[in-house]
Amino acid sequence: MSTFLLEIGLEEVPAHLVTSSENQLIERTRNFLAEHRLTVGAINPYSTPRRLAVELTDVAEKSESLSEEKRGPSIERAKDANGEWTKAAMGFARGQGATPDDFETRDGYVWLTKHTEGVPAKDILVKIGAEVVSEMKFSTYMKWANNAFLYVRPIRWLVALFDKEVVDFHVLDVQTGRVTRGHRFLSNEHVEISSADDYVSKLESASVVVNAEVRKNAIRSQLTAIAKQNNWSLELDTDAAQNLLEEVNNIVEWPTAFAGTFDKKYLEIPDEVLITSMREHQRFFFVTNHDGKLLPHFLSVRNGNKEHLDNVIAGNEKVLVARLEDAEFFYKEDQTKTIADYMEKVKKLVFHEKIGTVYEHMQRTGVLAQALAQSLNFDEQQLSNVSRAAEIYKFDLMTGMVGEFDELQGIMGEHYAKLFGENPAVAAAIKEHYMPTSATGKIAESDIGAVLAVADKLDAIVTFFAADLTPSGSNDPYGLRRAATGIVRTLQEKNWHIALKPVLTQFAQSQGEVAAADITAVLEFILDRVRKLTLDDGVRQDLVSAGVSRSGNTDVVYLIDRINVLAAHSKDNDFRDVIESLTRVDRLAVKQLTNDSVDPSLFENDAEKELYQATYALNLSHLVKEGADEVYTTLAGLQSPISTYFEATMVNTENAAVKNNRYAQLNVIHRLISELGDLEQIVIK
């Protein structure tokens, strides 16, 4: 069996694009092989900052042959009255590269069997340049020379080998060959690959570890060894450390780890500042002692070997110290002012030119936060903390530290608030109001912080909607979808049952033109996030649609609950029977909605009485408070009497009084069904 190698040689690709580009190359190659019916043993990906590559092992000699049956026109349309082939039949034959002599007739139609022979592998692989390499898409492009062609970075060389033979094609003016490039500084620039199987070893001899996973494991091992040697504690399994490890891995081809040191005096700066300076700005790994206390050392990785490593360490230490000097200055300078001083500056900080200032945004957030807190029955101390947090929670935006390190907004707000004597609960809320910072990030831990986070995001959505600055398509420049996701997740994980419609309606009415949004549109926007989150959790589309639809209930926690309840019970043996019975009630009830006043004296059969006995004592509001599962269980218990009812009862009887009474009885059940959703959207399987 043969091996095929494709390498795309590039100018330095930004670290954050390397892994996604490698993944895209693999996916496009996989689709290419499937489309051409060419089987391989494995698809091995490789990448460095200067190259993307894929190796196909055990490549079949040729693609699989294919026989397809094509159905043509009916026999009546294929032949005329004289038994001659019609234009429709002749056109069908031409389209398939055949003649009517090749026709078969069965099942009232003419058929053709189209056989496609397998194609030699090399004749297929020569197309990979046009169908894979040239078709790749990126979030960032570069144009070079006089080409209209755009790519992540300029293509400088191409290697395409089928075993030992070059597969000839070109992209722009770059022709494939067998010559790659070694490490930019450590080896001879040009490296000849004699056979596709030699790719990894040839590059390793040229100081390039081309396998990204092997390279990452080497970095991890080197860092761990240095930490162990110095009795330091190094955390590499957090999300932040994993992201840094991925980034560092994508800026080196031959990794060599090293340790550096900085003056102990800088440890007086908050840990978050030191860590941000090291991790975010210098790509350094911080270390601690075994009690978790930050140490005046760091670990980093160079793209090279150990030669002149002392010079590299000294250079990195010098750059870090310059950063820390700035941080120390800002930290001391910020403490010479008060929160009130910073808030005066916040009053002039623009939130959005169509909406107003950050200070005005904070005031509106305070109104919303109080409304939410009161609906959650916060005590007096909690309400006081919510009020104070809302008054000051953006003050740190005007500090020198956040101006220099904008990643620290909220974090420095909490730290400074404590230094300035604020209640710890208020200080924590300042940090937490940004949470969650991603679709899967942690929500605010404290109740004060969570209320502030929800209120801050709600005001942003309402005011941006009022200013007609809503997301369109994939475009969401103000992060409103992320904000809505944060609202839903916070309410869900806190298990806070809040009817959003009355809260937002009253808020919009009280805040004038700046908040004069279509609240129905705002709520639908938030419900879209409910749909996405539950779909992402693996719930069926029809169950999500059913659970979100037809409800005046704008408590997102309850809506998520009923979606999950429908999903859980969809596996029950009687789910089909239950849903069919309930949707039959629904279809009839919505045609003639009446009040719930049922007169038992108008019953004409035992089935009506049985259904009445099963439903007359139902307390709708109580069942809803108990939760969606209680609603479903109650409705499922009605399946048998409903079935019996419809077998024995004609709802649309001629007697108007009896008919209306029957609709009233069905309407009792319909109102309860509505608390579970629009069950007609459920696809019964």
Swiss-Prot record:
Reaction equation(s) it catalyzes: tRNA(Gly) + glycine + ATP = glycyl-tRNA(Gly) + AMP + diphosphate
PROSITE patterns xref list: AA_TRNA_LIGASE_II_GLYAB
Compartments, as annotated in UniProt: Cytoplasm
UniProt record, GO biological process: glycyl-tRNA aminoacylation
Domain of life of the source: Bacteria
Enzyme Commission (EC) number: 6.1.1.14
GO molecular function, one term: ATP binding
Subcellular location, principal: cytoplasm
Alphabetically ordered keywords of this record: Aminoacyl-tRNA synthetase, ATP-binding, Cytoplasm, Ligase, Nucleotide-binding, Protein biosynthesis
The keyword Iron is assigned to this record: no
A Gene Ontology cellular-component term: cytosol
UniProt cross-references to PANTHER family, sorted A to Z: GLYCINE--TRNA LIGASE, CHLOROPLASTIC_MITOCHONDRIAL 2, GLYCYL-TRNA SYNTHETASE
Subunit structure: Tetramer of two alpha and two beta subunits.
Family: Belongs to the class-II aminoacyl-tRNA synthetase family.
Name the record gives this protein: Glycine--tRNA ligase beta subunit
Biological classification of the source: Bacteria, Bacillati, Bacillota, Bacilli, Lactobacillales
